[in-house]
Amino acid sequence: MASLCSNSSTTSLKTPFTSLGSTPKPCQLFLHGKRNKAFKVSCKVTNTNGNQDETNSVDRRNVLLGLGGLYGVANAIPLAASAAPTPPPDLSSCSIARIDENQVVSYSCCAPKPDDMEKVPYYKFPSMTKLRVRQPAHEADEEYIAKYNVSVTKMRDLDKTQPLNPIGFKQQANIHCAYCNGAYRIGGKELQVHNSWLFFPFHRWYLYFYESNAGKLIDDPTFALPYWNWDHPKGMRFPAMYDREGTFLFDETRDQSHRNGTVIDLGFFGNEVETTQLQMMSNNLTLMYRQMVTNAPCPRMFFGDLMISGITLNSPGTIENIPHGPVHIWSGTVRGSTLPNGAISKRGEYGHFYSAGLDPVFFCHHSNVDRMWSEWKATGGKRTDITHKDWLNSEFFFYDENENPYRVKVRDCLDTKKMGYDYKPMRTPWRNFKPLTKASAGKVNTSSIPPVSQAFPLAKLDKAVSFSINRPTSSRTPQEKNAQEEMLTFNSIRYDNRGYIRFDVFLNVDNNVNANELDKAEFAGSYTSLPHVHRAGETNHIATVDFQLAITELLEDIGLEDEDTIAVTLVPKRGGEGISIENATISLADC
């Protein structure tokens, strides 16, 4: 088939590294429209030795997870609010990245800086006659594994011979460090691409350029990344192709106990669940159904809330929360454990944002995260991309496979086929895994359970707590349900954000519920939080957030649509003794 487009021209800018030379970009069938001029900001300049003025220090975003819901100040802000598009980072303001309040990253995560950022052009997709097709890692053959290992080997060689080359492996990993650990600032605030609507588009663009780089180094423009198919039982183990010692796809800082065919826990938060492999897989499929269907009926719930200039939000979408976060934790090592090389673990490369990209499995994991975006839209209903102009016009900065710097917009990454790649179709058993088995034979006697007014405020969640709560209305029509989602909200959850937090939520059960069996209709979701990254001198370690769960579908499945009062049970899983909750409410909300 003849190409339907011509090769696009590129603008080469001088950069501080030795060029590998450039090759023509392959032809692609799909092109986007013209792009707008970048939003210009003025940021703080850091001196060349990496030190920075701390007088304008601001809070890091809390790395919060919440299975099935959104929380934080964003819930009080309508999606139509004016937010201004997020501009690409000003590389001249790039500074040291932080691990926590007492540790800084020992090396610079900043990307090589072009001579003139104002002249960095917008990226145009190269023409292509054949889509790159990403395949599940557990189906990878020896030829593919060998090819990918050669590519990563060449990337790592560049780390030694041309350490500032942007397509070297370390420089590629540093992209995640800079965007996620406080190296970049915009308008005086740290840029963070997690916990908001930037999560999916940033990582899609990130993988796009990494994939192009990998293909360039092995002279294969059709090379496509594998994806860790953790949403399917056959992919619910650590990918074997990354677990071969002596290859560059292996990383010894991973959790050694999760090798050799161990079934992954997609809700893992540091504590091993004592159960069978079959039950774990069932739990995983339930989590996937809850995250992709029940708790993500509309864009706001799936993508996370908008990022507003000057306001720190902690409102990630469903998939970013779980399984994205737990897969990182499950793969990384436990802090303080001894690694095979005798070193003491700091949670492993994959367990930290700043170092996650140093483990090649990062790109395999995020390839499946990216796939979930496409699968979610294919589920139907209101599951469509965000149309807010400030999201569509937000920008990032990357280097392409020819070492040329570019600006990219969110609006240009909404269709993977237009970007030149697609995913090999795989069965998605979670679509039909709606948990219908009930833990309770009928409706729990709510008169025997304390009402919400007596249960709250809750001083500490150190044990399972049940309460009854009134609904705003009952027996809603299908039209009413389609117009508004019924939301269970926990207001003003407070805890020390330097530790791990998790609690699960169930409907229509009492505090004797088996919280290790998630494949029950009554399981609504989980609230989780990772340790917060603080800057030196910060004294406020208390987080205060709201947490929402969509419960319309659950009420139907449990048979509580016509009930005016329902029972809710909270089960602490991690750090419950330090959790307090002001109140709980049920309301109807536009989704």
UniProtKB/Swiss-Prot annotation:
One GO cellular component term: chloroplast thylakoid lumen
Record localization: Plastid, Chloroplast thylakoid lumen
Binding, Cu cation B: H324, H328, H366
Binding positions (Cu cation A): H176, H194, H203
Cofactor mode of binding and number, as noted: Binds 2 copper ions per subunit.
Record-annotated disulphide pairs: C94-C110, C109-C177
2'-(S-cysteinyl)-histidine (Cys-His), cross-linked positions: C180-H194
Subcellular location, principal: plastid
SUPFAM superfamilies per record: Di-copper centre-containing domain
Reaction equations catalysed: 2 catechol + O2 = 2 1,2-benzoquinone + 2 H2O
Keyword Translocase belongs to the record: no
Cofactor: Cu(2+)
Keywords assigned: Chloroplast, Copper, Disulfide bond, Metal-binding, Oxidoreductase, Plastid, Thioether bond, Thylakoid, Transit peptide
Transit peptide: 1-83
The organism's place on the tree of life at top rank: Eukaryota
Molecular function as annotated in GO: catechol oxidase activity; metal ion binding
Broad enzyme group: oxidoreductase
GO BP, sorted A to Z: pigment biosynthetic process
A Pfam family assignment: PPO1_DWL
EC number: 1.10.3.1
Family: Belongs to the tyrosinase family.
Function: Catalyzes the oxidation of mono- and o-diphenols to o-diquinones.
Designated name of the protein: Polyphenol oxidase D, chloroplastic
Organism in which the protein naturally occurs: Solanum lycopersicum (Tomato)
Organism lineage string: Eukaryota, Viridiplantae, Streptophyta, Embryophyta, Tracheophyta
